Amino acid sequence: MPRKGPVAKRDVLPDPIYNSKLVSRLINKMMIDGKKGKSQTILYKSFDIIKERTGNDAMEVFEQALKNIMPVLEVKARRVGGANYQVPVEVRPERRTTLGLRWLVNYARLRGEKTMEERLANEILDAANNTGAAVKKREDTHKMAEANKAFAHYRW
């Protein structure tokens, strides 16, 4: 924690094509070694693939996918009297979005398709249909929270 007080929150600029801060954040999450141009190209090609396959607006499909990935509950470790408990806590809206984007990118990278454009497009399509690895991650997170509901009174 900084001594000079809270750190000012940076606001991301919306991306040039879809004019969306959410898309801009996804581009930043995908970026490796500061290569933002490459990240943008991959994302826009993925959106083209989605539009081609579904016939729907890629932005709507992406928003639906993100909605299906974002967790509502998660567990946090809390030490009480020498024992660590996994305490279920509600996820703040900002963190929900961040986790959703992170899981989407991570599980897209782990997929088997040849190019990242295809991987990302397929992961977004799977998530929009409530399937895929990112949605499974959310379900697992919710299951953990449900299983540890007995420790909910340790919330802080």
UniProtKB/Swiss-Prot annotation:
GO terms for biological process: ribosomal small subunit assembly; translation. CDD domains: uS7_Bacteria. Keywords: Ribonucleoprotein, Ribosomal protein, RNA-binding, rRNA-binding, tRNA-binding. The keyword Chaperone does not apply. It comes from the Bacteria. One of its GO terms (cellular component) is cytosolic small ribosomal subunit. Part of the 30S ribosomal subunit. Contacts proteins S9 and S11. Interacts with VmlR. This is Small ribosomal subunit protein uS7. It comes from Bacillus subtilis (strain 168). The lineage of its organism: Bacteria, Bacillati, Bacillota, Bacilli, Bacillales. The gene is rpsG.
